[in-house]
Each structure stands twice: as structure tokens, then as C-alpha cells.
Amino acid sequence: MTIQVCEYALITSDTSQKSGLDLGIVSKQTFSWLETLHQQWEGSAQIVSRQGKRFLRLGSYVGYLESPTGEAIEILPKTRLGEDEDPIRQRRVLRRMLQAAAGITPREGETASLYRSKLPLHEWIYSEFLRHLVELVRRGLRSDYHLTEDDDSAFIRGQLDINRQIRQVPGKGARFHVRYAEFTPQRIENRILRTVLEIVLSSTKENQTWRTATTLKHQMADIEPVSDALSQLSRWSDGKYLLAYRAIKPWCQLILEKHNPDFQKGGHQG
């Protein structure tokens, strides 16, 4: 379930209140999690009490939060003072803010349909990642040479490891210790893409997003995911050979940071 509020809104677990963009109602478990979380926000949120009821007043934080129970809170920017807010317009502003912060330049031809989308922020990020990944797979993922060692090869390819070969046990004289460079798509960029794809596939609630991600998973079945993908982003190459990968990298970073424990605890604020 996703709760939609504006920045500076109140959050409570009191179900007798009337919910709206200025007041969000969450479960007691989520409210308790938010109370713990707000202590790390350095004064950008505060706990207030009204008629014996506890509320959390949000600060200037905008973006998307997801509690450990799976309850989501979409926090939209205020765009008008003293007037009724339009969630669609607010989400449009939030997406522009996100694009500017991440250095993302959307394609002009897709801007209109992108802004008409009613997807929550996180689902929109998933769909944009998949859109870029579909294009990459269509063009062809880049491969690279990787050194492979085979201690039980039936034939000689590449370089024979003489020292190990002369110590070969009797009866295995026809098996070879070899090293060779294999041209494979198992480069770090592709493995990060596969890891992010797994996150999207397990997290999305949108049918179309799930179908697209499933198709891509089958197409990338030979590529192994990588552990601790967020820290591996520093190994991502920005050379000319990977020019087509530059547009998808910010989307990978956004998704990986969302699923990073430090981000879930408020380490990143937007």
C-alpha cells in the first residue's frame, strides 16, 4: 500500500483522523519505524502531540520511503501556497527534481507520455531502467576478454600451464591445465545490470513492468548477478566502448541506493 503526502505533512497511526495530502495515516509498525528514522534526519522532521495523539511532521524531505513492513510513503513537493495541490503536477515536479539531481536528461520525444504517467515514483524509476535496458539488449550487450583457467581440459587452447602439467597425476596425461582469454558478456557493467533487474523483478507491483523484467531476465540468463552491487558501481567504465551504457547508470544507482540499508535508514535525503 502506498500513502501519498506532501512535504511538511503530518504522519500518524491514528485511524480516526481524515487522511489527505497534508495528513497521512500509516500502521503502528510503520509509525514506530518512522519515529526511529526521524532521529537521523538532523532536525528536518519532528514529533508533535495533539490531543494526546502523536504525529510526525515531515520536513523538506521529498521522495519515496518504504518501511520494513512494505508500506510505502510517497512524499511530493509543495507547488502552491494556500491552494489545493494537484498530485499529478506535484509528481511531475518531483521527477524533474530527481532528473536534475541525478544528472538525467530525458528524451524529448518521450517527455509528454512520461509526465502523463500515474506510476508512483519508485515504479516510474523501475520503468525507466527497463526502458533503457530493453534498448541496450536490442543493440547488443558489450563483452570483454576474461582470463579462464581450466584444470581438466580435453584439448589445449590458449596457454598450457607447464609447471602444473608436469605434476599431473598418472592416468590423466590426456587432460590439460590451460589458461585462455574468453570473450564473454560477464563484465561488471552487465553483472550490475542483471543484479538491478533482479531487484526490479522482485519489487515491482506493476504487471507490465514485471512482464518486461521477466523477458529481460531470460535474455540475460547467462550473465551472473554480482554481490554488493552498489559498491561495485565504482568499477563501472565510462569509456567510449560503453557510451550506450551511460544513460542507464543513474537509474541503476537510484535503484541500488533505495535497496541499500543506509538509504532505508535515511542516509540519503532528497
Model-derived features: positions:
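Helix-loop junctions and short alpha-helical segments
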Residues: 234, 238-242
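Long, well-ordered mid-to-C-terminal structural blocks that present hydrophobic/aromatic surfaces
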Residues: 266-270
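Terminal, charged accessory segments of proteins
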Residues: 1-231, 244-262
